[in-house]
């Protein structure tokens, strides 16, 4: 039964629907965190420097680029970045620089 349910999600329509739901969940989570901070005054080491993902093979990078484009359609500010831009964003990746094909970056994530 589980296998059939899994296979039913392996199509473009289900992928788009699931991405939309993940984006909605992420937006809700981000808003809820802001509410908790505002209402409680809780302090933590909050850093909003964004989240970078890097890829070491072209196929994975192309899939991530397609997903980033889809997410942009739902309002997520995730963008595709070159290896050079990724290394400017996160210099600690320099040791892997030659292996990196490219990446994605979401500035508003923490």
Regions found by a protein language model. Give the residues of each.
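Rossmann-like flavin
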Residues: 2-110
